[in-house]
């Protein structure tokens, strides 16, 4: 068949992104407009502000992606857009624009689950690198600021299927990073800040135990025969433990001084963050990261074994974390379990992943109706 060129659009949180891919295997362009510095002063993403920024950015971002791909709009075969999950207002901007573009160009529209996109971007890069087909079933850990999920993914004749075999009961892992960074006066986004600082601390200085969570659904109709193979997460407890450590070790004055010092710097560098952190803070950060990483790795490997997974994918914004990657590679390697990550630029939100996830649907003719809507709490199944 002729080449299939898909334009992807992503606007689920604080990145406005567009990308063009060919045949689900070649990235022709990928443009991301980040709002990090817009939200940094507030210590986190402000939903209404995010929506406004998407409105400003979406037209030029899409135009740039098409130009960078060396394509014209009439050469686009389909338009894919994130329909959820995410921030309702932010999603609406992307969905509305994609629908308008689909109508104006008379091109089919494909609605994509954001979480499925994170899974497919790993497969996309494997194809780009000429790596052979991965083995199924696949266990995918999707871990980011808003999500911590384990999915058993299989590729069947009727398409891809996903079974939720574990998720967070409260905070996502990336959310815990953001909250701890804010608590320590380091600001937003917490993930890359803490990852950089953790290298300078002692990860054995503070002990953070995790409770083992057993899945129990009170509704018998929702119970699955494989419930005993589930692995769930919880990260609100470690955030509270960090707060207690701060209070009992009289760190609040130093934190306020750090917060004040960083406010004077418009775009702090990693060296700036390191300069305002004392040994006690660095040890606390390193211990926090070691605890979260060990919890994610141990539970993902346990779920892989319980569900007879042949391959492990680790994806999402937190997958860019250096210690997480190193620990997964070492421990999965010891078990002989292949583990794959997206490249760091494609770990965070982007539109190449949306176009990649749309490609199988394009081949099977699964197109969205003209009344496609955004769904903030969309589930992957």
Curated annotation (Swiss-Prot):
PROSITE patterns: GLYCOPROTEASE. Keywords: Acyltransferase, Cytoplasm, Iron, Metal-binding, Transferase, tRNA processing. Its EC number is 2.3.1.234. Substrate binds at residues 142-146, 178, 191, 195, 321. One of its GO terms (cellular component) is cytoplasm. Binds 1 Fe(2+) ion per subunit. The keyword Transferase applies. Its cofactor is Fe(2+). Its main location: cytoplasm. GO terms for biological process: tRNA threonylcarbamoyladenosine modification. GO terms for molecular function: iron ion binding; N(6)-L-threonylcarbamoyladenine synthase activity. It catalyses: L-threonylcarbamoyladenylate + adenosine(37) in tRNA = N(6)-L-threonylcarbamoyladenosine(37) in tRNA + AMP + H(+). Fe cation binds at residues 114, 118, 349. It is found in: Cytoplasm. Required for the formation of a threonylcarbamoyl group on adenosine at position 37 (t(6)A37) in tRNAs that read codons beginning with adenine. Is involved in the transfer of the threonylcarbamoyl moiety of threonylcarbamoyl-AMP (TC-AMP) to the N6 group of A37, together with TsaE and TsaB. TsaD likely plays a direct catalytic role in this reaction. Belongs to the KAE1 / TsaD family. HAMAP family: TsaD. This is tRNA N6-adenosine threonylcarbamoyltransferase. It comes from Koribacter versatilis (strain Ellin345). The gene is tsaD.
